[in-house]
Amino acid sequence: MWQEFKKFAVRGNVIDLAVGVIIGGAFGKIVSSLVNDIIMPLVGLILGGIDFSGLSWKVGEAEVKYGAFLQTVVDFLVIAFSIFLFVKLLNNLHERIKKQEETKQTAPTMTKEQQLLTEIRDLLKQQKETP
């Protein structure tokens, strides 16, 4: 069982996934800071100095913190848009590489007429070279 686990854990896909999760977590922190420390204060300033983190409703004893929810929604939208742009960039790069490979692989094929003309040219060259 230990051998199976080692084989599973060392495979490239698992390691790639782990790296992706770690980078994703770090990216999430960066985006959260961007939203909480830059975007939302600017939006609050534009809307008249509102601090979104403190917005809430009192319903009896409960406090509904809709300001924090709004920040989380903006956080999600920024992350989703960033991922969209990244995936779009990767797709464009993939298409470019694919087109380059296709153009390399599709060597121009000569028609019968072109083949005959090439043979005639080569024969004429041979005749000129031999006295």
Swiss-Prot record:
Record bears the keyword Secreted: no
Molecular function terms, GO-annotated: mechanosensitive monoatomic ion channel activity
Any single GO CC term annotated in Swiss-Prot or TrEMBL for this entry: plasma membrane
Membrane topology: Multi-pass membrane protein
Main localization of the protein described in the UniProt heading: membrane
Keywords recorded for this protein, A-Z: Cell membrane, Ion channel, Ion transport, Membrane, Transmembrane, Transmembrane helix, Transport
Stretches that traverse the bilayer: 8-28, 30-50, 67-87
Top-level taxon: Bacteria
UniProt xrefs under InterPro entries: Mechanosensitive_channel_CS (IPR019823), MS_channel (IPR001185), MSC/AndL (IPR037673), MscL_channel (IPR036019)
Compartment(s) where it occurs, according to its Swiss-Prot or TrEMBL record: Cell membrane
Family as reported in the entry's similarity comment: Belongs to the MscL family.
HAMAP family: MscL
Role according to the record: Channel that opens in response to stretch forces in the membrane lipid bilayer. May participate in the regulation of osmotic pressure changes within the cell.
Subunit structure: Homopentamer.
PANTHER family reported in the protein's UniProt record: LARGE-CONDUCTANCE MECHANOSENSITIVE CHANNEL, MECHANOSENSITIVE CHANNEL MSCL
Protein name from the UniProt record: Large-conductance mechanosensitive channel
Provenance organism: Anoxybacillus flavithermus (strain DSM 21510 / WK1)
Gene: mscL
